[in-house]
Amino acid sequence: MFGAFVSHRLWSDSGCTTTCITNSIANYVAFGEQIGFPFKSAQVFIAGPRKAVINIQEDDKVELLKMIVKHNLWVVAHGTYLDVPWSRRSAFVTHFIQQELLICKEVGIKGLVLHLGAVEPELIVEGLKKIKPVEGVVIYLETPHNKHHTYKYSTMEQIKELFLRIRNTRLKQIGLCIDTAHIWSSGVNISSYNDAGQWLRSLENIHSVIPPSHIMFHLNDAATECGSGIDRHASLFEGMIWKSYSHKIKKSGLYCFVEYITRHQCPAILERNLGSSMQLQTALTAEFTTLKSLLK
């Protein structure tokens, strides 16, 4: 279930004006076939990302659904950076998130990723209660990156506390998006196979609270030190999490994450947004070649 973030800025043909998301996905699928790694998943923006504006056009909706069905792709949308239903602007935000969820349903997108805030679990649950569930579309709460806040949602205790509240409130269609760069930035050491294994075993111990069917991953290395609180992604084995394991990859924490992802069939997205299409494809070719070797 491995794939990547598909930015239409970097993936669509020049001059594309109406079906740019579909065009981007078509080019992305062709690229996966070219490098010998057929993609099973993808992540897109259908709105924003920095403004509350829907940016998928009607023609694009029709063609995107056809593309997703044709290639049997699991696609998730990332919410805008304003999608914070536990904020002071919650009424407007909730309405906008509802629009995004309905569009996801319409075009065959399976989920919407929202950034978790560094706030108490009860505030998050109250915000989620304002959103009407849309059948077949999961809201994935993404682990945040922070250094000083009490609630980082990078430890299993805090993740369990949050999802117990979600379950006890009978909220439906809520999942977890684990960003490896974010939990590292928040102080969780996942560099070695043993370190990552300890964290992932703790995750497996709470599958009764948050099942793997509702877990996805953002599989990123990080350009900053553990506990920095800074969100800066790097290519796999090029950042500070796993670079020291580039010549012993099966002893790395990344290999442990790959094992968990394949064992439980979780979607995993590489989030890269480099300066040019050529830079991006060069980086992804190296990363997916490495992943292919880990999947043997």
Curated annotation (Swiss-Prot):
Disulfide bonds join 16-20. It comes from the Viruses. Pfam families: AP_endonuc_2. Zn(2+) 2 binds at residues 115, 142, 218. CDD domains: AP2Ec. It comes from African swine fever virus (strain Badajoz 1971 Vero-adapted) (Ba71V). This is Probable AP endonuclease. Its cofactor is Zn(2+). Its main location: host cell. Keywords: Disulfide bond, DNA damage, DNA repair, Early protein, Endonuclease, Exonuclease, Host cytoplasm, Host nucleus, Hydrolase, Late protein, Metal-binding, Nuclease, Virion, Zinc.
